[in-house]
Amino acid sequence: LFFFSVLSISQDIGFSNVLDAVYPDENNLKFPKVYSADTAKNTTYNINLVVYSEKKSTVKLNYSSLEFDRISFNEVLDVPVEQNTGLDSRTEKFRGNINPFVIRRAPFRIYEIIKPISNNVINTNSNFSLINVKIPIHKNLKSDKYQINFTIKLNDMKFNLKLKLNVHDVN
């Protein structure tokens, strides 16, 4: 008898701070389903969603909130990094000095270009995908604690995420 096994990648999705380094090929990330943050009135709060899935997966994004009705989703596209920054020049190649402070050795790809999602659906191109969420915080919103519920369907799996925002006055 011949046994064939198909290895399928697990699927997951969670919040990620916009300052976290996220790559299309590999990451050592957690996928928190609940995230709390502080923000100010009259700004736009940004948070990322990291999707871990098979390539060509379908991700459908939805949210519910009484206070926030203009949330936008943006797919963050990856670009190549071909050379590392040099210690005393634009790249290491100019003088040949290796920069020990880089977070990853080139060549690799990194997320950088933001593309608006018009119908709240994307199809993934790599095992990790990055979705930027922009939440306008109105200047007349009361300083308080708010919650936004996200329902995300990744292929046939449903994920429920909660973003807790503490909105503050800026004086």
Segments predicted by a language model, with ranges:
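N-terminal signal peptide c-region/cleavage motif recognized by signal peptidases
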Residues: 3-7
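Surface-exposed binding patches on compact interaction domains or structured appendages
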Residues: 12-31, 54-133, 141
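A structural signal for beta-strand boundary/capping segments at domain termini and interdomain linkers
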Residues: 128, 158-160
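Outer-membrane beta-barrel proteins
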Residues: 35-37, 121, 138
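An acidic-aromatic substrate-binding cleft motif
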Residues: 160-171
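Beta-strand-rich extracellular modules
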Residues: 151-155
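Short, solvent-exposed loop/turn segments enriched in Ser/Thr/Gly
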Residues: 31, 41-48, 129, 140-149
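Short edge beta-strand/loop segments characteristic of extracellular beta-sandwich folds
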Residues: 46-52, 134-136
